[in-house]
Every structure is written in C-alpha cells, then in structure tokens.
C-alpha cells in the first residue's frame, strides 16, 4: 500500500541519516472528509516515530486540462476545518505549514475564469489588491469563497 511505501521510505531515509522528512498534502479534494484528515494524521504520526516531519499543506485548486478541471472549490470554511484537524492531531508530532486558503480560492476562480474574472482582477487591484478586494469583485460575478454546505463531511 501507499502507507507501507511511505514507511519504508522513512526507514530508508533514517538509515541514510537524513534528518527530516518533508511531506506534501493537498486538502479540499472532491469527496474529502474529516475522517480522511484523521487517517492522514495517523500516518504522519507513525512516520514521525522514525524521523522528524515537516508537512506542507496546500488547498486543492482545479486547473483546466486536468481530470478534475470542473471540480468545485471545497470552500474556505471546509479547508480551514480540515487543516485545523491536521494541526490538532499533529501537535508536537510534525511541523505543519499551510499555504493561504483564501488565495487558493482566488487562484481557483482565476483558473476557471473568463474575461469577466479578468476585469474583476483589474477592479480588485485598483481598489488595493487585498483578499477582501478580490472577494468583493468575484462575489459580484456569483463566486463565493465558502462551501454551500459547510457542515457536510
């Protein structure tokens, strides 16, 4: 299994005197649940018994030309909840760093956008270029950074 491969890789790294294992994880994938985050955390805790772990977390952003190009954005609220689950479960076991969920939403809107979103970028930048400026400009086009059903998991 993948977990067995990761454990073997960590053992090999330890034998080679590599000091730290860096892992990358994406949250917000279609169908992802809190249970999935708990399982990921359990695996990272197991790996941390072999080596110190640095865990980088990014939020899924669908891209044109990929199999998941039409997948919706999970929602800032859902991604935050999943990252919080990981941070809590890995406290003292792994160094956890997450990229900005808010800017991942902006990236998501732009990745699937059209000329209208391009004009919204112009408007947001003219107003200052903060996340709030982007959110307001994109919300005028019907984009929302939060999930339709934040409790669904």
Residue ranges and their predicted role:
Residues 47-51, 84-95:
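Structural alpha-beta junctions
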Residues 19-25, 53-58, 96-98:
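Hydrophobic faces of well-ordered beta-strands that scaffold small-molecule active sites
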Residues 25-31, 59-63, 100-104:
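Active-site-proximal loop/turn and secondary-structure-junction residues that shape catalytic pockets
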Residues 12-16, 54-59, 148-151:
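Short, compositionally biased low-complexity segments
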Residues 73-87, 117-126:
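Acidic, Ser/Thr-rich peripheral helices and adjacent loops at domain boundaries
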Residues 1-49, 65-81:
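Conserved non-cysteine loop/helix-boundary elements of the Radical SAM core domain that shape
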Residues 91-153:
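Radical SAM enzyme core and accessory elements
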Residues 35, 51-53, 59-61:
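Contiguous mid-protein beta-loop-alpha structural module that forms a pocket-lining wall or clamp
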